[in-house]
């Protein structure tokens, strides 16, 4: 893959030969103008990000955005993993990269990697003016000036949805507590009967360590995201942000997707309609506990929460539930 650093998009550059795209189809960093802009496959593209906690609706936001012909959003890239590596590279006092000019060069290289990786996916949508990443993660600005969509969902619904998925696929959160007897028992029961939690909803949140961990992680991300959004609004961080809750989007997807297009400077009238096939209408058909497209409803936590689970959640995330506006007190 050949790349060229140039501010002149007409300057000839080697092609992406591995993809056999022709002489004019390359990726190039543009050093002038907006920092979230890149030259990709014959034209400039602008880059954006969709973030939120896992099981909060980042996939849905992406699907809604892609109903507009000028938007393509792919993922998940998990650039935060790469960022940790670059930060470690520049952290230790005996690392040369802690001092200039290597420090600035390393940051520039990280940002260039983000730009080029996202822009490379524009090959799948040649007409896209905007190309994005939809990784579920805390809000962190990797490209100065880039627009960010941040979605927040009731942590109790997140807990239910993520618990079912993690137990079903033995995901990374499950693996953290796989030695917990209560959690191992739940997975055994699920593997024997994929309808186990539908038949026994009071059993889902019976592993205290697992339940508290997910609630704690959700609370930590809510705190971080809200604080970061405040800094963006105050001008302390160079970015723009569109924040929305899953519940708002669920109640009126047409209104809010129009606002999302306008946030990127696009005409909502050009967007395609929402359809069941594109998975852009609220909720999903059925309730398949083996699928990551399980249900998508609001308030599903009422079915699964016991008094014990409520107590665990309030202790781990009650303050953040109130801060996010889902409750006015812990008396729920």
Predicted regions and their residues:
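Conserved phosphate-donor/acceptor-positioning beta-strand/loop module used by diverse small-molecule
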Residues: 144-165, 313
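PAPS-dependent sulfotransferase catalytic domain
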Residues: 31-35, 42, 160-163, 167-259, ...
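C-terminal accessory extensions appended to soluble enzyme cores
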Residues: 302-332
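Glycine-rich phosphate-binding loop used to anchor ATP phosphates in small-molecule kinases
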Residues: 113-141
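PAPS-dependent sulfotransferase catalytic core
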Residues: 1-119, 125, 168-189, 291
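Short catalytic/ligand-binding loop motif for oxyanion handling, primarily in non-cytosolic enzymes
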Residues: 56-62, 80-83, 139-142, 156-161, ...
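Hydrophobic/aromatic beta-strand patches that form the interior of the parallel beta-sheet core
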Residues: 48, 72, 147-150, 242-244
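The conserved 3'-phosphoadenosine-5'-phosphosulfate
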Residues: 85, 231-307, 311
